[in-house]
């Protein structure tokens, strides 16, 4: 449900107010005050609605209303207030005693707006029209930074690879398993070990051989020397299958020389 009308529009006058109607409205308000605008027209003997009576009184019949044209000071004040408040005419009228909001709005559209345009000022924004933009547009690009980072990464990687290659060249390669025998032979591993030990003892290279007391005195090839016996025993012991002498007795499992 909407708001009920203030009066019956079928029995109200419309259009311009007559001088007689203005005098009745002024006389009633002076005698009784403004009061309720809904009941005022009937009490004052006016065939008008309450809204029409209120607007006629506020905008035209009030005794404190200023008559005549706007002054230059009022024009500058209206321009300043409009730049701060915009089109809020009722607030602007509150700062101008004796002037109504409707009067100020009409005066703005007919006079002040044209005055601002003649000065080259936009009436809406209150700025100079066709003013070059003073704002500097700064663009931030990350492309150069990314390229510099890529170049740094490539240079660091190249330096690291160069250092790694220099370390590989300068450092000798160490065998992880120096005692590992990779020779391919059919003979048993014990015989290979005995051959290597015999070769080291005969050539003198390799590990230190055991010297008896007679040899330590400088009497080599003496009967009391036990080094020759040890060597012959080692040689004979290494040839336990008779592969060197090619003489193997399967009955006694003893080797003999031809």
Curated annotation (Swiss-Prot):
A GO molecular-function annotation: transcription cis-regulatory region binding
Coiled-coil portions: none
Gene3D superfamilies given in the database record: Homeodomain-like
Ranges of residues in domain HTH myb-type: 9-61, 62-116
GO cellular component: nucleus
DNA-binding region (UniProt annotation): 37-61, 89-112
Description of what induces expression: Circadian-regulation with peak levels occurring at the end of the light period in flowers.
Gene disruption: observed consequences: Increased expression of C4H1 and C4H2. Higher levels of floral volatile benzenoid/phenylpropanoid (FVBP) compounds derived from p-coumaric acid (isoeugenol and eugenol).
PANTHER family (UniProt xref): MYB DOMAIN CLASS TRANSCRIPTION FACTOR, TRANSCRIPTION FACTOR MYB8-RELATED-RELATED
Protein name according to UniProt: MYB-like transcription factor 4
UniProt source species: Petunia hybrida (Petunia)
Lineage: Eukaryota, Viridiplantae, Streptophyta, Embryophyta, Tracheophyta
């Amino acid at each position: 449900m909407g708001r009920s009308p203030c009066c019956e529009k079928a029995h109200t006058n419309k259009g311009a107010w007559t001088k007689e109607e203005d005098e009745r409205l002024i006389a009633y308000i002076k005698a009784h005050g403004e009061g309720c605008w809904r009941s005022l027209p009937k009490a004052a003997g006016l065939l008008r609605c309450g809204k029409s009576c209120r607007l006629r009184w506020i905008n035209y019949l009030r005794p404190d209303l200023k008559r005549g044209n706007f002054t230059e000071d009022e024009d500058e004040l209206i321009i300043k207030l409009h730049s701060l408040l915009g089109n809020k005419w009722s607030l602007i009228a509150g700062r101008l005693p004796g002037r109504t909001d409707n009067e100020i709005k009409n005066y703005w559209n007919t006079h002040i707006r044209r005055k601002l345009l003649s000065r080259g000022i936009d009436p809406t924004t209150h700025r100079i029209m066709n003013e070059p933009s003073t704002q500097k547009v700064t663009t931030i690009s990350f492309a150069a930074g990314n390229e510099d980072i890529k170049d740094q990464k490539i240079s660091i990687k190249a330096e690291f690879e160069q250092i790694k290659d220099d370390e590989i060249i300068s450092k000798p390669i160490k065998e992880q398993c120096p005692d590992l025998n990779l020779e391919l032979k059919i003979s048993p591993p014990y015989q290979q070990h005995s051959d290597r030990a015999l070769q080291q003892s005969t050539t003198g290279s390799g590990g230190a051989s055991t010297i008896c007391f007679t040899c330590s005195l400088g009497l080599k090839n003496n009967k009391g020397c036990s080094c020759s016996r040890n060597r012959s025993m080692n040689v004979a012991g290494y040839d336990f299958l008779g592969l060197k002498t090619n003489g193997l007795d399967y009955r006694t499992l003893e080797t003999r020389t031809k």
